[in-house]
C-alpha cells in the first residue's frame, strides 16, 4: 500500500487573523479542506479522515509563507487523514494511503510515484507544479480568500505591472 506523510512537531504560533489559514490543508474531490491545529486535536481520537470518491488530491501543512505537502500519483484512489499524535509535545501529521494497494507478482516489480513540495508559496511555482504533474487546485495552498475568482486575476495583473514598471 503506497503511502506518504508530513509531520509537524509542536504547535506553531499563528497570526490569529481570520483572513489567513495556517494549519493542515488538502484538496480532495477537487475541493479545498482546511483544518486548524485545534480542530485536529479535538477530532474523534485526534484523527480526521477523508475518503474522496475521485482519484488524486494532495495534503500538507501551510503557514503564512511556506507549504509542506505530499502529492501522490493522481491516477489512484487514496484515503487522506489529518492527525494529532500523543507525546510530550504536540505533533501533527497529514498522510495518505493507497486504498487499493498494489499487487506484486513473483519476479515482477511495481512502481508508485509521489512528490513532496516543501518551500515558499510562490504562485508561478505552484501553477507550474499543477500543470506539470496534474495536481488539482494546487494554487489553493495560497489563501486568496473568499473572492478567489477576483483576487487571483488581480494578483496576476499587479504582478504583470510590476514586471513592466518595477518597484519604485
Task: Go through each PLM region and give its residues.
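Soluble non-transmembrane domains of integral membrane proteins
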Residues: 1-138
Amino acid at each position: 500500500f503506497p503511502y506518504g506523510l508530513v509531520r509537524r512537531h509542536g504547535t506553531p504560533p499563528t497570526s490569529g487573523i481570520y483572513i489567513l489559514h495556517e494549519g493542515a490543508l488538502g484538496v480532495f474531490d477537487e475541493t479545498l479542506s482546511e483544518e486548524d491545529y485545534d480542530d485536529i486535536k479535538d477530532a474523534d481520537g485526534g484523527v480526521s479522515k477523508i475518503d474522496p470518491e475521485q482519484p488524486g488530491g494532495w495534503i500538507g501543512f501551510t503557514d503564512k509563507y511556506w507549504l509542506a505537502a505530499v502529492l501522490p500519483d493522481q491516477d489512484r484512489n487514496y484515503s487522506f487523514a489529518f492527525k494529532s499524535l500523543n507525546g510530550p509535545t504536540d505533533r501533527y501529521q497529514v498522510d495518505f494511503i493507497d486504498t487499493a494497494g498494489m499487487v506484486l507478482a513473483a519476479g515482477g516489480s511495481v512502481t508508485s510515484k509521489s512528490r513532496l513540495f516543501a518551500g515558499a508559496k510562490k504562485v508561478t511555482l505552484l501553477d507550474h507544479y499543477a500543470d506539470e504533474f496534474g495536481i488539482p487546485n494546487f494554487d489553493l495552498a495560497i489563501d486568496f480568500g473568499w473572492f478567489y475568482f477576483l483576487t487571483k486575476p488581480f494578483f496576476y495583473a499587479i504582478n504583470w505591472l510590476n514586471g513592466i514598471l518595477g518597484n519604485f
